[in-house]
Amino acid sequence: MEQPKGVDWTVIILTCQYKDSVQVFQRELEVRQKREQIPAGTLLLAVEDPEKRVGSGGATLNALLVAAEHLSARAGFTVVTSDVLHSAWILILHMGRDFPFDDCGRAFTCLPVENPEAPVEALVCNLDCLLDIMTYRLGPGSPPGVWVCSTDMLLSVPANPGISWDSFRGARVIALPGSPAYAQNHGVYLTDPQGLVLDIYYQGTEAEIQRCVRPDGRVPLVSGVVFFSVETAERLLATHVSPPLDACTYLGLDSGARPVQLSLFFDILHCMAENVTREDFLVGRPPELGQGDADVAGYLQSARAQLWRELRDQPLTMAYVSSGSYSYMTSSASEFLLSLTLPGAPGAQIVHSQVEEQQLLAAGSSVVSCLLEGPVQLGPGSVLQHCHLQGPIHIGAGCLVTGLDTAHSKALHGRELRDLVLQGHHTRLHGSPGHAFTLVGRLDSWERQGAGTYLNVPWSEFFKRTGVRAWDLWDPETLPAEYCLPSARLFPVLHPSRELGPQDLLWMLDHQEDGGEALRAWRASWRLSWEQLQPCLDRAATLASRRDLFFRQALHKARHVLEARQDLSLRPLIWAAVREGCPGPLLATLDQVAAGAGDPGVAARALACVADVLGCMAEGRGGLRSGPAANPEWMRPFSYLECGDLAAGVEALAQERDKWLSRPALLVRAARHYEGAGQILIRQAVMSAQHFVSTEQVELPGPGQWVVAECPARVDFSGGWSDTPPLAYELGGAVLGLAVRVDGRRPIGARARRIPEPELWLAVGPRQDEMTVKIVCRCLADLRDYCQPHAPGALLKAAFICAGIVHVHSELQLSEQLLRTFGGGFELHTWSELPHGSGLGTSSILAGTALAALQRAAGRVVGTEALIHAVLHLEQVLTTGGGWQDQVGGLMPGIKVGRSRAQLPLKVEVEEVTVPEGFVQKLNDHLLLVYTGKTRLARNLLQDVLRSWYARLPAVVQNAHSLVRQTEECAEGFRQGSLPLLGQCLTSYWEQKKLMAPGCEPLTVRRMMDVLAPHVHGQSLAGAGGGGFLYLLTKEPQQKEALEAVLAKTEGLGNYSIHLVEVDTQGLSLKLLGTEASTCCPFP
């Protein structure tokens, strides 16, 4: 499904509080731009807050200044000018404060969500969800201006929230519904019936909250999202040059101004609320400031006075999204676990993870970006993220475990965790990288002082159980009433003699029976509190290790998808590997799968995936993906594949590939050769159809006696493409086809006879001699181009080889072979009265007639079903590929369904469709062919379809299943004798063909179909489309002249013609005629 049009952001800014994280988060924004989550032209900026406690308002003002500076510079100005805001859509995202459950903050907390329609596979963070909401849901339709969005909440917004921007000015807040009880700990808006904001309450009284209740019984919560019009943004930007608000920006800080802390909602926006008076506003304090000294209050009052002067006359309105939802990400582990799990779910959520024993994951648990090897048991309501674990491990209910690797698994063996939060952290202490671990209880409070808990028990009980003392954790002067979890020096970060692991904290869960050894080791370690640990976290290493683990599990997934033959697309994963700069490990994995595959289908798909990786690495440059694949440099690996040595072939391909990686043009050519290698394996799979080719020896016709084979054309009514290898044996194919005469004639034929000369005389073309191409093969060298489809007579040469008359690699000369077995040579003519690229199956049916005539001339009879498989074999020898529907349609009489199962060897079975009496004549009266005048170019269409199938693009896989399913429905339409039902089948069949091969409907054909639409039940181009014949089921009988008149009135249709068509009930016919002189001799 196509993504709706979103906001084309001019600038996206991500604010963060740590200077050393700016570059890290800048890269994260750039990665998202490469993934196409952010428009290519958007300016991306990660901006450090000028001071750690600058507040959401100060961070907004600083970010707005930085955006204006960059846009001013880009526009060629030498000073900041607010004019640049007039045509800009700016998005400011605030990272906010530290989060106890993710080292990279609430923005980069991973959610148990997968986006199956994303072009690039990736973990979904809260930031990604908010970007999507802002770009595609809240942002569209807004005028130029500045959107500001916190990242400390989980939001859900419907696809069309119904926000009107008519006559908008000022600022607009987005509110989402919540219960009055939830609002007691949050912000809530009071508005008038028109949506004008009257006041904003934070942790309001019951009476205040009741005033905000809407008719639905809910209250509009402060959601953390606000929009400033250009005018309001200019007013806000103007404050950055005046004290004390200049201290909110990096310019003020660089000038030595004293920092000031401002709230976006309770300072900047609050002054715009209608009911707020100047006096109340000036003495108020934002909730994030807390209680402080009078000096701070006076400084803040001055800042608020300035905001009042600039912004008071700007209207503040609210957009209430009644069907959305809002959840603030608190420091409660219980609430966090609840937000990441589905308590009533029937099973576990497994996202971007590979789990060997899924049955050990309890319902209502969640696993994100993990590799779990062996027995890893996970209890209900528990969450595993970014872990590579090796069992046996038992994680009970109510746990959060993140950031552990295989080296840490041993510490968890033989122990059950319950109601705990265990995290591994990347650190950088005095410039040296390291690992630290934190362990807390699910029920522990990060805010409570004094009567708090640790590991879910009161501090006193913890001290008693472990031997830890208060002075181990806090300074001696700290009073018991001041004990709190964030300041407790609990967590070892460095041990004097060994590496640290989870065991350095897990000992605290039990009464000690080791004589105090663990306690002594803990005391001997350098320990930090959670607050002290935050500035030491290495966020670059954290994100790098998450990315590494994501790709490690992705390689396991790729291997499993290929080896288990799953219909999952690896294209998004391929794009991820290429765009994040690590295609090498993926290529190595694909090589391993291809080399070790016992199934040519699995190996061919793996090679097609390699071709996809190379194509993606070219990034749209270097030419078209479809093209020649016969460069001499690649012949050595191809030769290994041809002789069945898959492992050597794959290795040789990889060695050659390494020489073609330096620039896009070479990458594209290498991709073509990998597709060529895949074709070799497809060919070997299809060759298995030879199992079902058998001949019966009969009397040899006399020298000079002609054997004539004639065939109708075929029209496909449903299921085409499903017969094409590899779909035919990977998905299983089903095609309904009709054998048809065109203008009363059977247009395809061949004749063969023995001649005394030990040579092969070949003639190709219509029966009229002046158009015939004549070829004489006197030696084996004359046959060597049998596998080059465009070489003159290639199909006829391949027919001699496939019929076993000539052995092209024999040491015997051609004349010796012919004299020894047949006492002379052969003459073979083939003809078709249909134009090239007709779409009526000409070449495959021609191959069938040529084989039938040749075999009979050589004293053998081939059954029609055997002949169907023989043509499959011949077309692989000829290297044109192709499916089985054409020969089934033309060689077998009447109306029938051909089917092949999802297995090798490839076998085609044919079922005749019985229709009501008189229906064939009725069909003849309503069926017409229109030659469009356009030649179909099926070769590139075929390559594109195979590429899409091997990539298992979801739309193509779904469509392929629909093709097979509809064939059975179409057969039912014939059994009922219902023309309207068959017309519906044709119409939907044409839509399916277009989905399978985009580009198969030329504009002139579309115009012709539009003109004919009112007169027909249904219509479709024959075969793969792109040109050739259009067939129609007319509403009225015998409409040839009427439709000729309709088309004659339409300009620009080109050289078209309308033809009568009737169902042929004979199929392939074979006759022996008398002897006569050759019509094409003397040969040159």
From Swiss-Prot:
Gene3D superfamilies assigned: 3.30.230.120
Binding of ATP, residues: L834, P835, H836, G837, S838, G839, L840, G841, T842, S843, S844, I845
Metal-binding as UniProt keyword: no
Expressing tissues: Expressed in fibroblasts.
BP GO annotations: carbohydrate phosphorylation; GDP-L-fucose biosynthetic process; GDP-L-fucose salvage
Family matches, as InterPro entries: GDP_fucose_pyrophosphorylase, GHMP_Kinase-Related, GHMP_kinase_C_dom, GHMP_kinase_C_sf, GHMP_kinase_N_dom, Ribosomal_Su5_D2-typ_SF
The family this protein is said to belong to: Belongs to the GHMP kinase family.
The protein's name in its UniProt record: L-fucose kinase
Origin species: Homo sapiens (Human)
Gene: FCSK
